[in-house]
Each structure stands twice: as C-alpha cells, then as structure tokens.
Amino acid sequence: MLGSPCLLWLLAVTFLVPRAQPLAPQDFEEEEADETETAWPPLPAVPCDYDHCRHLQVPCKELQRVGPAACLCPGLSSPAQPPDPPRMGEVRIAAEEGRAVVHWCAPFSPVLHYWLLLWDGSEAAQKGPPLNATVRRAELKGLKPGGIYVVCVVAANEAGASRVPQAGGEGLEGADIPAFGPCSRLAVPPNPRTLVHAAVGVGTALALLSCAALVWHFCLRDRWGCPRRAAARAAGAL
C-alpha cells in the first residue's frame, strides 16, 4: 500500500513532462539561413581624406591605419623609381619685404623630402635646405625688387630626385617652362617705397632746374636789361 502513491507519482511525472524532440537536419538549415539573412553587408570603401596639395598633409598610409573605417589611397609609383616632378602652385610675392611664398602639390610617388632651386640669372642655382615630405609651402627671402627669378621644387626618395627643365646658357631664364610643371618664373615688382623716393627725387630736381632757370633769367635781365624796353626806346627815338 505504501508503494501505490509513489507509483502514481512516477506515472504522473512521466506523462506530464514534455519530451525533448531531436532536431532534424532541415532545422539546422533553416537556422543557418536565418543567420545569413540577418548579416550586415560590408561597407563600401571610400577615399581617404588626403589632399596632395594640402600643407602638412599626413601620409595616406597613416590615415588608413588611424581611420575609423577602411579608406582608399591614390595609387603611387614604385619606390624603386625616382619621384615624378611636383606641380608648382600659387606664388605670392611681397615686394616690400623682398620675399615670396611658394606653394606646390605632391606627385603621386613615394617622397622622402623636397628642396627648392632658385636661379637669379646666373647658371648656378641656389639650393635650399631639405623639407619634410608633409611640407607643401616654403618661403624665399632676399629677393631684389625688380629682379626676375626662376624657382623649381624637387622631390626626392631613395631612388633619386625628380627632373627639372634643362638650363640653357643663361640658366633657366630662356628655358621653356611648362605651365603645370615643377618650375615658375618670378617677376618681383619694384618696391613702392623706391618708386615714391624716385618720384620725390625727380620732382625735386625739376623744381631746382626751374628755380635755376628763373635766377639765370633775372640775372641776365639785370645785366643786359629787358629786350622789350630797349626796343621800345629805340622806336621812340625814331
């Protein structure tokens, strides 16, 4: 009699507890299909925020490493070849201070550093100091008012340096300089202060000449008398 309640309890648990059903292969395929449908598509790669004309521009490879998402860099030539020539940009001349600010754009080549070449009418060019690869702007000092110069920017890497136009017998003054090449002609205007001083000097000289002419005229008049009065006296005597 004591075993009857236990037997009834076992029978109730056996029939009331739901039995686990084995998963069929079709169920696994449905789960995999659901996961595939909910997967996000890969984001399209966008160009990196790189401007080859921007001053102090961070290299594009560094932008790819630190960026929040993948980006694309412009194609570059082989580092085993010398860089292509940079492209000269805007040149601002300050005649009063005797200086000029030169701007350029980097070539699509690996570059380690830049430097400037300046011709002032002589065959030998003045070479500036090396500039960092992120630099796109440099300053020229000591320019003479009214002078004509030719400035070129050179890019260099381990394989060599970029090309510049060939200099003629008088430097680059008579060379054919392309419009979008690495060189540009600088025509420094005369210093405005020099023009003012020259105008004041010319005006002073004219004033002195006028005064000298008047003094000379009155001296001759006092010495020889007025020609008109002498003619009038002669006519009256007749």
Swiss-Prot record:
Residues 1-22 form the signal peptide. Residues 82-176 form the Fibronectin type-III domain. Keywords: Glycoprotein, Membrane, Signal, Transmembrane, Transmembrane helix. The chain crosses the membrane at residues 195-215. It holds the Pfam family fn3. Residues 23-194 are extracellular. The keyword Glycoprotein applies. Residues 216-238 are cytoplasmic. Its main location: membrane. It comes from the Eukaryota. InterPro entries: FN3_dom, FN3_sf, Ig-like_fold. It is found in: Membrane. Glycans are attached at N132. GO terms for cellular component: membrane. It is a single-pass type I membrane protein. This is LRRN4 C-terminal-like protein. It comes from Homo sapiens (Human). The lineage of its organism: Eukaryota, Metazoa, Chordata, Craniata, Vertebrata.
